[in-house]
């Protein structure tokens, strides 16, 4: 719950106004598991809370561990649905990849979540629970909203979750610790930029509209050229980072022709490109470019003034890498 929601709750139960901040502190700072632990609230108010609410933290129901240290957690949400989140430890940081929906409507050709189809939006509480219930939460340094689902398609709940992560009453994290990944939706992109200070990453994957629409049907609703024109109205030259994600497919978008088109498309934007290796998924006739090709592509862009990195791949052996999250099997098993 946000502070405004907690204030409304306190008022409804006849609690003093300051109780909302006390409850928030217990939930997000002290991370209690039960209302009984909120000892600076009177017994009367704790009983009132218990009659109407519960902390609601749900532990993961399953986990898978990669040889590279990545951990994929499975959460049950509601009666019949599941989502996955991915914990990625590194030498100097630990990142959690968080989901915003059960499945996804975007149906990107290269993504298993999209193949699963859309099932439900997560509430802000269900998004926050992936952090709150993370066994390694005390080691966490960064959050990326790039798990299952399209965050801008569930923007009200996502913005509430981001508020809890960044507000003084919540986790009090710097927005610079959080990145939202999106295909770019007309109805939500501008609002996110203006209502949040978190980093932004756009799924690009092709600078050409026709090809991008074949890979990502969302291009038909809001073209990448329109998106770039919108982004030029905002300042990304300081601490807030704008990046474009680009899966490099063998023989499809990996030539110098595409590198030149990227330079043309993104000219005038303060941004970076993250190149991503494609991870094979069942039933998809795409193949990833080899590392030599990706390195040449990166070097060409970098020498022409566009800062470009090759993102390391983690958790592929447990289907936790980019584009590989899916709970279709668990959803089907839960029906039977």
Task: List PLM regions with ranges.
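Canonical Radical SAM [4Fe-4S] cluster-binding loop centered on the CxxxCxxC motif
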Residues: 89-126
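Generic beta-strand structural signal
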Residues: 71, 83, 94-98, 106, ...
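Conserved AdoMet/S-adenosylmethionine-binding subsite of the radical SAM
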Residues: 135-142, 147-311
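Auxiliary Fe-S-binding modules of radical SAM enzymes
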Residues: 1-83, 232-241, 248-336
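Short linear Ser/Thr-Pro motifs
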Residues: 66, 99-100, 203
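P-loop NTP-binding catalytic core
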Residues: 79-88, 92-93
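Ferredoxin-type iron-sulfur electron-transfer modules in oxidoreductases and energy-metabolism complexes
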Residues: 125, 129-137
């Amino acid at each position: 719950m946000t502070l405004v929601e907690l204030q409304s709750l306190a008022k409804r139960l006849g609690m003093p106004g300051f109780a909302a901040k006390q409850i928030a502190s217990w939930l997000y700072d002290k991370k209690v598991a039960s209302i009984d632990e909120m000892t600076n609230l009177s017994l009367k108010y704790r009983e009132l809370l218990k009659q109407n609410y519960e902390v609601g933290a749900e532990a993961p129901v399953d986990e898978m561990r990669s040889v590279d240290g990545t951990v994929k957690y499975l959460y049950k949400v509601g009666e019949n649905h599941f989502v996955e989140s991915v914990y990625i430890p590194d030498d100097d940081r630990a990142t959690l990849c968080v989901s915003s929906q059960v499945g996804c409507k975007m149906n990107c050709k290269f993504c298993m979540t999209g193949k699963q189809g859309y099932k439900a939006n997560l509430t802000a509480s269900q998004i926050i629970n992936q952090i709150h219930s993370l066994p390694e939460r005390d080691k966490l340094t960064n959050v990326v909203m790039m798990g299952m689902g399209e965050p801008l398609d569930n923007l009200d709940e996502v913005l509430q979750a981001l508020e809890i992560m960044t507000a003084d009453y919540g986790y009090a994290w710097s927005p610079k610790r959080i990145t939202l990944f999106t295909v770019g939706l007309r109805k939500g992109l501008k609002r996110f930029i203006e209502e949040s200070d978190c980093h932004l990453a756009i799924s690009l994957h092709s600078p050409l509209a026709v090809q991008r629409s074949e890979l990502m049907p969302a291009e038909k609703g809001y073209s990448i050229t329109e998106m770039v024109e919108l982004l030029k109205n905002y300042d990304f030259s300081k601490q807030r980072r704008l990046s474009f994600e680009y899966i490099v497919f063998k023989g499809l978008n990996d030539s110098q022709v595409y590198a030149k088109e990227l330079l043309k498309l993104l000219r005038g934007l303060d941004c970076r490109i993250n190149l991503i290796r494609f991870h094979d998924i069942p039933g998809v006739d795409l193949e990833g470019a080899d590392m030599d090709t990706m390195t040449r592509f990166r070097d060409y862009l970098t020498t022409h003034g566009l800062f470009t990195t090759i993102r390391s791949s983690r958790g592929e052996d447990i289907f936790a890498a980019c584009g590989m999250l899916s709970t279709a099997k668990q959803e089907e098993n839960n029906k039977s």
